[in-house]
C-alpha cells in the first residue's frame, strides 16, 4: 500500500497518518522528519539542505527529491509507505512518479482530507497552549476550566504565533496555490480519493480505512 496524504494545514493529517501507519503496518514518512534526520546525521544531502535553510532559502527540488528517494529505498518501505508533506508541486509529483515507476512501486492512492477554510480557521485560531507545561486546549472544543489558565499547573495559556488568523490565512493561501494543481494532477491519474475532514477523528479514520481497504 503506497499512499500520499494531502490536505490543508489544520486538517488533522498528523493524527490520521499515525492511525494509518499503525493499522496498515506502513511507515509514516514526513518530509520534515527526514530533513531533520539527514541534517542531524550530516549526510551529503542533509549538509546541502542545511546550507539553503541557514540562508533562508527554499531547498531546491533536486535536493528534496534526493532525500525522499533515499528514504523510500529503505527496507521498511518494501510493503508500502505513507508520504506526508511531499510532493508539494506537480514537478515534484512527476519526479516521484518517474522514480517509483523505475523501481516497480507506483502509487496506489493520493488521499485528500478536505476541510473548509472557515472550519480550519476556527480549529487553528482557537488553539491555546500552556506556557509552562505545554498542555494544549481549544477555546471551543476543549476549553480550560478557568479561561486563560492551565488546568494542570494554573499557568497562563497563550496563542502561538502560527495560530493567529493572519498567519493561518497566509498558510492556507500558500497551500491553495501549491496543492490545487497537484490535486488535479492526481485526479487526471485516476488515483485521488477524498474524505471529509470535518467529522470526528474516528469517523474520518473509518472512511480512510474503507478507501485503503478497497485499494489493498
UniProtKB/Swiss-Prot annotation:
The lineage of its organism: Bacteria, Bacillati, Bacillota, Clostridia, Eubacteriales. Pathway: Purine metabolism; AMP biosynthesis via salvage pathway; AMP from ADP: step 1/1. Consists of three domains, a large central CORE domain and two small peripheral domains, NMPbind and LID, which undergo movements during catalysis. The LID domain closes over the site of phosphoryl transfer upon ATP binding. Assembling and dissambling the active center during each catalytic cycle provides an effective means to prevent ATP hydrolysis. Some bacteria have evolved a zinc-coordinating structure that stabilizes the LID domain. This is Adenylate kinase. InterPro entries: Adenyl_kin_sub, Adenylat/UMP-CMP_kin, Adenylat_kinase_CS, Adenylate_kinase_lid-dom, P-loop_NTPase. GO terms for cellular component: cytoplasm. Gene3D superfamilies: P-loop containing nucleotide triphosphate hydrolases (3.40.50.300). PROSITE patterns: ADENYLATE_KINASE. It catalyses: AMP + ATP = 2 ADP. Monomer. It comes from Clostridium botulinum (strain 657 / Type Ba4).
Amino acid at each position: 500500500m503506497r499512499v500520499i496524504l494531502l490536505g490543508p494545514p489544520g486538517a488533522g493529517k498528523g493524527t490520521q497518518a499515525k492511525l494509518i501507519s499503525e493499522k496498515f503496518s506502513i511507515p509514516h514518512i514526513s518530509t520534515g522528519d527526514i530533513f531533520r534526520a539527514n541534517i542531524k546525521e550530516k549526510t551529503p544531502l542533509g549538509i546541502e539542505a542545511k546550507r539553503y535553510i541557514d540562508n533562508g532559502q527554499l531547498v531546491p527540488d533536486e535536493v528534496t527529491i534526493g532525500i525522499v528517494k533515499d528514504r523510500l529505498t529503505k527496507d521498511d518501505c518494501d510493503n508500502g509507505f505513507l508520504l506526508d508533506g511531499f510532493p508539494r508541486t506537480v514537478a515534484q509529483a512527476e519526479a516521484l512518479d518517474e522514480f517509483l515507476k523505475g523501481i516497480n512501486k507506483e502509487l496506489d492512492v493520493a488521499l485528500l482530507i478536505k476541510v473548509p477554510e472557515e472550519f480550519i480557521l476556527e480549529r487553528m485560531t482557537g488553539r491555546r497552549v500552556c506556557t509552562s507545561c505545554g498542555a494544549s486546549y481549544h477555546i471551543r472544543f476543549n476549553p480550560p476550566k478557568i479561561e486563560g489558565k492551565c488546568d494542570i499547573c494554573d499557568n497562563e495559556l497563550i496563542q502561538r504565533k502560527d495560530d493567529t488568523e493572519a498567519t493561518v490565512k497566509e498558510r492556507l493561501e500558500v497551500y491553495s496555490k501549491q496543492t490545487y494543481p497537484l490535486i488535479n494532477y492526481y485526479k487526471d491519474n485516476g488515483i485521488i480519493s477524498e474524505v471529509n475532514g470535518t467529522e470526528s477523528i474516528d469517523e474520518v479514520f473509518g472512511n480512510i480505512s474503507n478507501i485503503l481497504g478497497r485499494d489493498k
